[in-house]
Each structure stands twice: as C-alpha cells, then as structure tokens.
C-alpha cells in the first residue's frame, strides 16, 4: 500500500548544513512568488472541466484560517502541494492515498483545468485547489501546526546564476513551512536540476525545525510517480533528486 514516508521513531540523520542564508538583495516574502507567469491556452476539455467541477473543487482565496474539515467534508491528514503543473502526479498521489486530503496551489488556468479533468475522470474527492499564489496562502490561510505534509515537485530551477535568488526553496519560505508542519510531518521536494537539489538540501538542512529522513538525498517514495517528462529525462541520462525532511518536535 502506498503511504506517506514512515516515521521510524529514531532521530533522523542530518545532511551537512550550509549557512542557509539568503542573498543579501533578496527581500521576503514579496520578492519570491510560488509561480512563474507562463503563456498557455486553456483547451476545450480543460474549460469544460473548469465549468463542471470548479465550483466543487476550487476554493476561494480568503485571508483567514482555512477550515479544512469543512472544505473537504471530513477530518483527515492535510498535505499542501505548491505548484502542480498539469496535475499528472497530483491526481496519481491522491488516488493511491485516499486517506489523505490534498490542498493544491496553482495559478495557471490550463493546469487547474487539467487537474479538474483528471479529478472528474477518476472520481477523486480528496483534492481541493486554490488558484492563488501559494506564499500568500501559507501566510494567511494556514496556521502553524496545520499541515501533515508539503510537496514541492519540480519548481522552476532558474538555471542562470543571476536568477538563483528567484528560486522558491529559500530559507524564509522553508521556515514558514516548518512551522506549519505538525511534529513528524514531512516536507518533500523533488527536482531534476542538480544545482537546485544541492541548494534544497543545504537550505532544508539549515532549518532547525527539520531533520533529514535520509543520509543526503532520499530514495524516491513509492507514492510519487514518474511523469512523462521525468521518464523522458531519465532516458536521456538526466538525474532526479528527492529531498525528504521531517518536522522535529
């Protein structure tokens, strides 16, 4: 059975920590968004899914604590996903983990429509979408200790060195996420860009509320599928790195 990474009960090892300090010219939280503006056309199928399922599965952004039990209609572990692209991995994970609820942030309408289409096709009930910047959602809708897990899969790597400061996984955001995790909750990042993987490992290792669940990079958890894009990269010899940390008490 697919499940969230097991808590082994022992103190996880920590990867070597860097200084964890953001560049001097980076201002938080306003300078870092959870998304990059992209052009994209909403297809007919996506538009139909938005019309058919949007009112049921897309939540309004409202500053103030989210009532997750009311939003999902039950009390269950809550996982935040920051940026889900076209929703391929999101729908798979929600399907193999029906016991968990997934609050998914994505601003791009084609992606929202694509995930809604998958929700309808698969009869998923444990996903809710916020078409809003995840940083503002974290700041204004998610109280401390409200999350059981966080997924950040393949965020924009900002390849050029002068753009590295725009990367999402930076110390201030990680500190916010760590405080919003319950003790034992997890933060799972994945990237196919090794320099970003190294930065992720350094930043997460420097956060005192988090401890590495592995000795460095983690094995790919069974719940995270290989996407078509990822499979293509692997065929071309590209690597993929998973980083999995847990909130300490």
Swiss-Prot record:
One Pfam family here: Methyltransf_4
Location of the region described as Disordered in the Swiss-Prot/TrEMBL record: 1-24
Signal peptide: none
Residues that hold substrate according to the record: 160, 192, 227-230
Pathway: tRNA modification; N(7)-methylguanine-tRNA biosynthesis
Region ranges (Interaction with RNA): 162-167
GO CC field: tRNA methyltransferase complex
Leading EC class: transferase
Enzymatic reactions: guanosine(46) in tRNA + S-adenosyl-L-methionine = N(7)-methylguanosine(46) in tRNA + S-adenosyl-L-homocysteine
Family: Belongs to the class I-like SAM-binding methyltransferase superfamily. TrmB family.
Protein name per Swiss-Prot or TrEMBL: tRNA (guanine-N(7)-)-methyltransferase
Native organism: Paracidovorax citrulli (strain AAC00-1)
Taxonomic classification: Bacteria, Pseudomonadati, Pseudomonadota, Betaproteobacteria, Burkholderiales
């Amino acid at each position: 059975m697919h499940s969230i990474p097991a808590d082994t009960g022992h103190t996880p090892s920590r990867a070597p920590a860097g200084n964890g300090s953001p560049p001097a010219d980076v201002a938080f939280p306003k300078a870092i968004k959870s998304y990059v503006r992209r052009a994209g056309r909403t297809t007919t199928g996506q538009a139909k899914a938005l019309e058919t399922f949007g009112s049921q599965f897309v939540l309004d952004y409202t500053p103030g604590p989210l009532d997750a039990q009311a939003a999902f209609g039950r009390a269950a572990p809550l996982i935040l996903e920051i940026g889900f692209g076209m929703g391929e991995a999101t729908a798979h994970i929600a399907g193999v983990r029906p016991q968990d609820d997934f609050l998914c942030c994505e601003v791009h309408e084609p992606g929202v429509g694509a995930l809604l289409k998958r929700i309808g096709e698969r009869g998923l009930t444990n996903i809710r979408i916020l078409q809003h910047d995840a940083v503002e959602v974290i700041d204004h809708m998610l109280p401390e200790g409200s999350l059981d897990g966080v997924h950040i899969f393949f965020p924009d790597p900002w390849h050029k060195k002068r753009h590295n400061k725009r990367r999402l996984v930076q110390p201030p955001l990680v500190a916010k996420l760590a405080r919003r995790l319950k003790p034992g909750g997890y933060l799972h990042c994945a990237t196919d860009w090794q320099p970003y993987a190294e930065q992720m490992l350094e930043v997460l290792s420097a956060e005192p509320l988090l401890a590495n669940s592995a000795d460095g990079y983690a094995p790919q958890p069974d719940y995270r599928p290989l996407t078509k894009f990822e499979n293509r990269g692997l065929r071309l010899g590209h690597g993929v790195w998973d980083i999995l940390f847990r909130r300490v008490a």
